[in-house]
Swiss-Prot record:
Subunit (UniProt): Homododecamer.
Binding site for Ca(2+): F361, Q363, D365, D368, Q370
Any GO MF annotation of the entry: metal ion binding
InterPro entries given in the database record: Br/Cl_peroxidase_C (IPR016119), P_Acid_Pase_2/haloperoxi_sf (IPR036938), V-haloperoxidase (IPR052559)
Record protein name field: Vanadium-dependent bromoperoxidase
Family label: Belongs to the vanadium-dependent haloperoxidase family.
Keyword field contains Oxidoreductase: yes
């Protein structure tokens, strides 16, 4: 029997009304205005005959720079801003990108022998107009905001860049060995240096901006060094269970009162995740230990001028479970957008972690007479955990390109290095980072030793002093501004979906860490309690901070972007809730420690 036409028309009208209701819900959220920190026009060229803005605190990667790392022509940056705000393809194509070209070969003229010998080409800015795109679900990319980023002269920025230098100097440290005697000297040095900074040793004051207060971290200890501050991130082992463990495989099941285990079923905790009838390994390629990049000034300047060094890194044979800071930096170099959260979802599903009891049809089938799949089941959460990712990216691209345009940490390291060397020439070239140079004294001396060793290994027998931030990636940062972080905003959105669907309060019965000697998991000595929500929060922090460990983001980039991604996911859940006929709610523990119902 067919469906009567009047019923079809009624259904079409109800569908239309639901879409309108979702649009009205999005509209009624309002718009939060975005404000930058004012640095773009604050800093000026020191030459009294040319007091144009220097744009030294802005993202200028790709534009031509002088020998100190400042852009040569401020008009290039102004044209860049106009083009990205218009989104016009021709305007963007007409921008100045990279250095002058050789009239005979047509190749860019680089400063370093390395870039010239490789005949490198330039790389272009990445999706600079993505924040201008409209979407059909969730908050509009321009309707939510991030607070102003810390300024170059602030104690917070000094603390952020100090932390990045220390992470870079400790890339071979194993996460399970932070408290090992063999690492005691480095770990204690890092703790002492951070605790000696105003940002870590001075409490927030009445009148401080709320965003600054929530980012402020207290005393640094072995237990919280380089960790995030989301609920659960400081509990238990550094690495989230969901980035190291595997899952139950097909061939392992309980039928009636019998547990059937195939003799060929992979061990649940060997780092192999069931992806249907195939498996995904949690193991990562092993980047060459001790190999850092952009430690030479000429190479650094070439990268700022758009030299495309992507793919120039090197690896050892094989792969292993994440063990070191460098391993985590490598993981976040090549991950496939929502990879970590899809993997976590597969682990949760395969290991039988229950959905939130407030969702429909969570009783036994004999009581509900139906099981979940398309709605409120595996198909639903597997789709939605990936669906939110690009919506979150569009929101953060708007903040990156159209609002804040914050310089990347590598560029801050460039300013610091030039200024650290400048007194030898009797001048301060970038007084805006004088505080950082002073406060990071001992850290910079260790960075110089590390950079010298790297530059000698790269073929320079007598390298000039270099206080640059050692980078884990040959190409340095991605080709878009620093604030906020794409990895972090996706982490915030995807983890929010997982916490909304699964029973987040469930305790994890067995805790694992990566063995310090062999490529295997071992039971952790941690005696406390880990929960699903805490380990999902920790997963988000691990991925976001992994980018900091590579040298491409600051702590504030990561933290504020996690919160932005959470907003995107909540908006999508609110709108999709209008489409269901069942009476239910999502119970969501938020990143600020509160719980809401959607």
């Amino acid at each position: 029997m067919g469906i009567p036409a009047d019923n079809l028309q009624s259904r079409a009208k109800a569908s239309f009304d639901t879409r309108v209701a979702a649009a009205e819900l999005a509209l009624n959220r309002g718009v939060v205005p975005s404000f930058a920190n004012g640095e773009e026009l604050l800093y000026r060229n020191p030459d009294p005959d040319n007091t144009d803005p220097s744009f030294i605190a802005s993202f200028t990667k790709g534009l031509p720079h002088d020998d100190n790392g400042a852009i040569i022509d401020p008009d290039d940056f102004l044209a860049f801003v106009r083009a990205i705000n218009s989104g016009d393809e021709k305007e963007i194509a007409d921008l100045t990108l990279g250095p002058a070209r050789d009239p005979e070969t047509g190749l860019p003229i680089w400063r370093s022998d390395l870039a010239n010998s490789l005949e490198l080409e330039v790389r272009g800015w990445e999706n600079s107009s993505a924040g201008l795109t409209f979407d059909l679900e969730g908050p509009d990319a321009q309707s939510i905001a991030m607070p102003p980023a810390p300024v170059l002269t602030s104690p917070e920025l000094v603390a952020e860049i100090a932390e990045l230098y220390l992470m870079a100097l400790g890339r071979e440290i194993e996460f399970s060995e932070f408290d090992s005697p063999k690492n005691a000297e480095y770990i204690q040095f890092a703790i002492d240096q951070l605790n000696g900074l105003e940002w870590f040793n001075t409490p927030a004051k009445l009148g401080d901006p709320p965003a600054e207060i929530r980012r402020r971290r207290g005393e640094v200890t072995v237990g919280n060094l380089f960790r995030g501050i989301l609920p659960g991130s400081e509990v238990g082992p550094y690495l989230s269970q969901y980035i190291i463990v595997g899952s139950k495989q097909i061939g392992s099941a309980t039928v009636g009162n019998k547990t059937l285990v195939s003799p060929n079923a992979a061990d649940e905790f060997d780092g192999e995740i069931a992806y249907g009838s195939i498996t995904i390994s949690q193991r990562v390629r092993i980047a060459t230990p001790g190999r850092d990049f952009m430690t030479d000034l000429k190479v650094f300047l070439d990268v700022q001028d758009a030299a495309d060094f992507r793919g120039f890194e090197s690896y050892e044979p094989g792969a292993r479970l994440i063990r070191t800071i460098r391993d985590l930096a490598t993981w976040v170099h090549f991950d496939a957008l929502y990879e970590a959260y899809l993997n976590a979802c597969l682990i949760l599903l395969a290991n039988g972690v229950p959905f939130d009891p407030n969702l429909p049809f969570q009783q036994e089938d004999k009581l509900d007479n139906q099981d979940v799949f398309v709605n409120f089941g595996s198909a639903h959460v597997l789709s939605l955990v990936t669906e939110v990712a690009t919506r979150a990216l569009k929101a953060v691209r708007y903040q990156k390109f159209n609002i804040h345009r914050r310089l990347r940490p590598e560029a801050t390291g460039g300013l610091i290095s030039v200024n650290k060397i400048a007194p030898q020439k009797g001048e301060s070239i970038f007084p805006e980072v004088d505080l950082a140079v002073e406060e990071l004294g001992d850290i910079l001396e260790k960075a110089e030793i590390s950079n010298r060793k790297q530059n000698i290994a790269d073929g320079d027998p007598d390298p000039d002093p270099s206080f640059l931030l050692p980078m884990a990636f040959a190409e340095g940062s991605p080709f878009h501004p620093s604030y906020g972080s794409g990895h972090a905003v996706v982490a915030g959105a995807c983890v929010t979906i997982l916490k909304a669907f699964f029973d987040s309060g469930i305790e994890i019965d067995q805790v694992f860490e990566v063995d310090k000697d062999e490529d295997k998991l071992v039971k952790s000595s941690f005696k406390g309690t880990l929960t699903v929500a805490g380990e999902l929060n920790k997963l988000a922090d691990n991925i976001a901070i992994g980018r900091n460990m590579a040298g491409v983001h600051y702590f504030s980039d990561q933290f504020e972007s996690l919160l932005l991604g959470e907003q995107v996911a909540i908006g999508i859940l609110e709108e999709q809730s209008l489409t269901y006929g069942e009476n239910f709610f999502f119970n969501l523990p938020k990143f600020d420690g509160t719980t809401i119902q959607i």
